[in-house]
Amino acid sequence: MIIDTHTHAFPDALASKTIPMLAAKADVTPHTDGTAAGLSAAMQIAGVDIAVVLPVVTKPSQFASVNAFAAELNKRDGLISFGGIHPDDEDIPAHVAEIAAMGLPGIKIHPDYQGVFIDDERYIRIAREALRHGLYIVTHAGVDDGFPECVHCPPERAVRFLDQVYEGREPAEPRIIFAHGGGNRQFSEVRKHLAGRNVYFDLSFIFAYADAEKITELIRAHGAERILFASDCPWGDPAEGIRFVRSLTLSDAEKEMILGANAQRMFAKYIP
């Protein structure tokens, strides 16, 4: 089973406006139209069995609509959607509990889109509440190519975030995922500060520019059992990502873990 753990889909009317805007901002060519149907089609072509959709709440007032759409996505075959919350949310404990009650497996946060540093107390509160409810947390990490001016989740701050969330008691099974290899375009800092910590890294988008040797070194430093295949579709091509992982100088068992076994273990109760 192949699971793409980092994808995006928008309501049809919103996708037609949002995808061209973000594509122009980051100077990338999208691989789908940004709709759920477009995402499902891309996954089928690539041979992906399940796509995990990660929404972003860019202002507190979007909480209800974003999470309602996430719940609708979870009714579609082959899609598992996280929920979202903004750090300025007026009632973080209640809304995290609501996400859990909706049956969503976790929460996506995006420090660059939300304009808050990852080690801010508001994100600490969100993460602690999420973990209390058994939810996963996925955060954008490193440079955002569309908004490169300020990096809100560099590896050094990510470490401070972890230390405050876990308070020295890291769980046996990781429940926090740092996207883009732990820090987009910051692999040296990731290896120095984050590699080896009890967290997952996903591989979203980085195969589009990073060479195989650097990514293999990162995987070796962190451990294949804590690496998740991800394309960032529509910004990355899942088929290209699968080919990239299969080309790495890793064992077949390590490639199997990355492409799906790790995520299958994480999301077992959400997979029919």
Predicted region positions:
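Active-site gating/metal-coordination segments in enzymes
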Residues: 49-50, 60-145, 209
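Mid-to-C-terminal alpha-helical segments outside catalytic/metal-binding sites
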Residues: 1-8, 14-50, 221-228, 239-272
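Mobile, glycine- and charge-enriched loop segments
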Residues: 1-31, 67-84, 191, 196-200
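Catalytic pocket-lining loop regions of alpha/beta-barrel enzymes
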Residues: 105-106, 120-228
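Structural motif corresponding to alpha-helix initiation and N-cap regions
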Residues: 33-37, 64-67, 89-93, 120, ...
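A cross-domain feature marking catalytic cores of carbohydrate-active enzymes
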Residues: 7-9, 55, 83-87, 109-111, ...
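Conserved, mostly hydrophobic/aromatic
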Residues: 6, 43, 70, 99, ...
